[in-house]
Amino acid sequence: MITNVSIKNYKSVVDVSLPLGRFNLLIGANGCGKSNILEGIAMGAAASSDKLDYEYFANRGIRVVDPRFMLPAFDDIKSDRISIGFTNGDNSLATFDIFYNKDTKPAHWQDESVSADSFVAYVGENLSLHGRMVKDMIERINKMKSNKNNSQLQNLRLKPIEDDVRIMTVDADLNRFLIYSLEETILRKADDSNRTYPLGRHGEGLFAYLKELSQKTEGEEIFNEIKENLKVLDWFDDMQVPSGQLSMEFNLKLKDSYLAETLNTFDQRSTNEGFLYLLFYLTLVISDETPKFFAIENIDTAFNPKLCREVMKMLIALAKKHDKQIIATTHNPAILDGLDLSDNEQKLMVVQRSVDGYTKVRTLNNKDIVKSDLPLSQLWLRGFIGGLPNNF
């Protein structure tokens, strides 16, 4: 798991260090730089994959603009280099120094960092399968070492190998980093027009992927876990993928517990948007084919305030269970009430602009919270933790 991200000279983010946990929530006023932070991480992920091109940017959630606007536009900042660094515990995974090379035809973004870290990143991407094989081998050897009869294995040192495998695995997760920003019109479409398998950043491919899961033996457990968690919605009774669909048909059969037996099923075209958003997030977190490390913009969209709290608790628990790492943004105070800041794996970060306009980040913990019986949502609304406009 990535434990820290440093971003320098990306748009309004001049110099920010972001300590990460399992679930990380960014709050702040409109225009404070929350999306810029997410894009900076995506920029580093693009560099780690050696895919610094505009098509890749768009598919990963980076807003494609004139290269001049990818760099800070402050009078006192003259750097033409974007620097993105990633850390896993005590290990520096990689640091990428990215610049726009105008001397080539066509001009393009380029990573000029050549280091052992970036080499490890390359190895991690291309040998992730071997990494898993070595990891399995290490586990088996450790079991053999525990047997005192295997005296020849007692002094075998595996720690350096274990560290390398861990770095390779984490870096492979970084390469798939994606910023999800759902759109109802796209989410509701029943097609498979998706450039990022299995789920697109706006909601593409959801029904095609659920159909695929329903047709695989190993997908049944995932499908059932998704259904079980959908029961947080009081009306939800069941969800099935109808048999006999044509290859290009992608429909769901949903059952409402309140409706009469003669008319209690319908497809996704008739359901509410909150259900669709929740279905997508559950699929994203539970599936083992989706990215391990990703971001969600405006995670509160389409949810009732009370549901926001329960969805947060649910997604955090599922992220721990399925080894996912999530960064989310919100403007809805109710989302904060699903956080438990006594858990070090849950982070609340306040994003704001400095007097010079730079984006800065402050991580809150229990010691920073005013002693009060008020929930976090009310502490935010009343201005005790920041993250609000201060010009009115």
Task: Pin down the residues of each PLM region.
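Well-ordered beta-strand positions in beta-sheet-rich domains
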Residues: 15-20, 93-97, 265-267, 360
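Conserved P-loop NTP-binding catalytic core
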Residues: 39-104
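Conserved ABC ATPase signature
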Residues: 231, 235-306
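C-terminal lobe/lid and adjacent interdomain/linker elements of RecA-like ASCE P-loop ATPase modules
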Residues: 56, 60, 73-74, 310-392
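Short loop/turn elements that form and flank the Walker-type P-loop nucleotide-binding site
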Residues: 1, 14, 19-21, 289-290, ...
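Catalytic acidic motif of RecA-like/P-loop NTPases
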Residues: 11, 24, 272, 300-303, ...
